[in-house]
Structure formats: structure tokens, C-alpha cells
Amino acid sequence: MADSSIYSTLELPEAPQVQDESRWKLKAVLHRPHLSRFAMVALGLLTVILMSLLMYQRILCCGSKDSTCSHCPSCPILWTRNGSHCYYFSMEKKDWNSSLKFCADKGSHLLTFPDNQGVKLFGEYLGQDFYWIGLRNIDGWRWEGGPALSLRILTNSLIQRCGAIHRNGLQASSCEVALQWICKKVLY
């Protein structure tokens, strides 16, 4: 047998341009997750910044004593706002239980100082009048729905089982006596 070799020349069309285009498309597909991740992180940061600014604005606006911001909760008519609380100072007089019911009907409670702080400071703003507060003596002096009283309260008689406040501090009184009262409501 004779040794015969056949040679052929293979001519391929120039395809580097096609390969370059496919490489770019492949790179674009591979880089898309990085871009979407970057976009999500950027949007997340923007959201956090905007929420922080809104909270800061609310604190500045709503935290002021005499806030007039339209989006801040306001006190009902005839109530006085101080910080995040509304206070109602009655003009009429009722016994302690009727005063307690009045406040409850208004979604509030008789004024209390559960941490026993602020009694003296609050009393300085009151005149000569006595006001019922959420304090009574049932097995010891206790704030309504709260802890025991750790302050001194003036009392003259065993029938004085309800607490009142005036400019000189706390005073015990008979619960049937008609006094003005102070309700306290939390705004937010």
C-alpha cells in the first residue's frame, strides 16, 4: 500500500468579533447581580436615612411643649399639653370615685406619680385649691395601678383614705369630699 497523505486546509471565517460580542454579553449577565445588589443596598440605605429624618422631625416637632405641627397628636379641648401628656384640670368638684370615673370615661386616669418624682414640682403650679389624684389608702398608700407611695402624706383621720395634691404637697382626705381633680392622658 502506498503511503498517501491527504492534506486539507481548513479556512474558518473570522469570528473573533462574534466571540468578543458573546464575551461582553456573558460579562454583562455575570455583572447584573452585582448591579442589582448595589441598587438594593443603595435603596435600603436611602430608606433608613429618610426614616431617620422623619423620626427626628417628629421628635423635634411633637416633643415641644406647645407643638402646632399638624401631624402631631393634640389634646382634647379644655386639656393642657405638656410633652407627651395631656392634663385636665377640672373646674367643678366631685368625690374621689366620681373623679376617677370621669377620667376613665375620657380615656385617661387620675394624675399619678408612680416614681414618686414630680409631686413637689407639680404642686408648685397649683394655687390654694386641692385636686384629687390617683392615690388611695387600701392596706397602705398606693398609686392607682402602680407602686406604693414612698413620700409622706398629711392625714388627720382614719377616714381620710384618698389622696389630693395642692401647692404644699400631698394631703389625705375623705373620699366623699367634693374636690376638683386632675386627669392625665398619654398622647403617644
UniProtKB/Swiss-Prot annotation:
Disulfide bonds join C75-C86, C103-C183, C162-C175. Residues 82-184 form the C-type lectin domain. Keywords: Cell membrane, Disulfide bond, Glycoprotein, Immunity, Innate immunity, Lectin, Membrane, Phosphoprotein, Receptor, Signal-anchor, Transmembrane, Transmembrane helix. Residues 1-33 are cytoplasmic. Its main location: membrane. GO terms for cellular component: intracellular membrane-bounded organelle; plasma membrane. Residues 57-188 are extracellular. Gene3D superfamilies: Mannose-Binding Protein A, subunit A (3.10.100.10). Changing L10A: Abrogates completely INPP5D recruitment. The gene is Klrg1. Expressed specifically on natural killer (NK) cells and activated CD8 T-cells. Not detected in spleen, thymus, lymph node, testis, brain or kidney. Not detected on mast cell lines, bone marrow-derived mast cells, or peritoneal mast cells. The keyword Cell membrane applies. Forms a monomer and homodimer; disulfide-linked. Interacts (via ITIM motif) with PTPN11 and INPP5D. GO terms for molecular function: carbohydrate binding. It comes from the Eukaryota. A motif (ITIM motif) lies at residues 5-10. It holds the Pfam family Lectin_C. GO terms for biological process: cell surface receptor signaling pathway; innate immune response. Contains 1 copy of a cytoplasmic motif that is referred to as the immunoreceptor tyrosine-based inhibitor motif (ITIM). This motif is involved in modulation of cellular responses. Upon phosphorylation of ITIM motif KLRG1 associates with the two phosphatases, PTPN11 and INPP5D. It is a single-pass type II membrane protein. Induction: By pathogens and viruses infections. Phosphorylated in response to monoclonal antibody G63 binding and antigenic stimulation. It is found in: Cell membrane. Plays an inhibitory role on natural killer (NK) cells and T-cell functions upon binding to their non-MHC ligands. May mediate missing self recognition by binding to a highly conserved site on classical cadherins, enabling it to monitor expression of E-cadherin/CDH1, N-cadherin/CDH2 and R-cadherin/CDH4 on target cells. The chain crosses the membrane at residues 34-56. Glycans are attached at N82, N97. This is Killer cell lectin-like receptor subfamily G member 1.
